[in-house]
């Protein structure tokens, strides 16, 4: 088996792992980003609405989200409606967003390993 050496090994190609890999590579580290699925976001278990200002802070491109001008938050005892002329929130295309983040990590220099399970951590 070929021996590979990296400064940083990130386990999990979700948004946190991909973002960590991106920042580490951007700052000069050699990085392995390890994902157990065959491809990033093969199995997505989340969705939702978030603020556009927060999306932009993470550099997520517009093609990864759908702006909305009206929405409601509902609970068993209360609801709040929010609307306006300018969209302040958006529904993320989670699969597209995760893949964008992983690709950004690769572009920064991280090496992506898919279909790879981490079963043990060995410290040198």
Question: What residue spans do the PLM features occupy?
Answer:
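A short, compositionally biased
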Residues: 65-70
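Conserved N-terminal helical subregion
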Residues: 73-124
């Amino acid at each position: 088996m070929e021996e590979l050496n990296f400064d940083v090994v990130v386990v999990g190609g979700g948004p946190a792992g991909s973002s960590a890999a991106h920042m580490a590579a951007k700052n000069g580290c050699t990085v392995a980003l390890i994902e157990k699925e065959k491809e990033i976001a093969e199995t997505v278990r989340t969705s939702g609405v978030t603020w556009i200002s927060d999306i932009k802070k993470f550099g997520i491109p517009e093609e990864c989200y759908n702006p909305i001008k009206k929405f409601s938050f509902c609970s068993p005892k209360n609801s709040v409606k929010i609307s306006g002329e300018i969209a302040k929130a958006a529904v993320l295309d989670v699969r597209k967003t995760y893949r964008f983040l992983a690709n950004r990590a690769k572009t920064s220099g991280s090496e992506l390993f898919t279909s790879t399970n981490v079963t043990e951590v060995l410290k040198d």
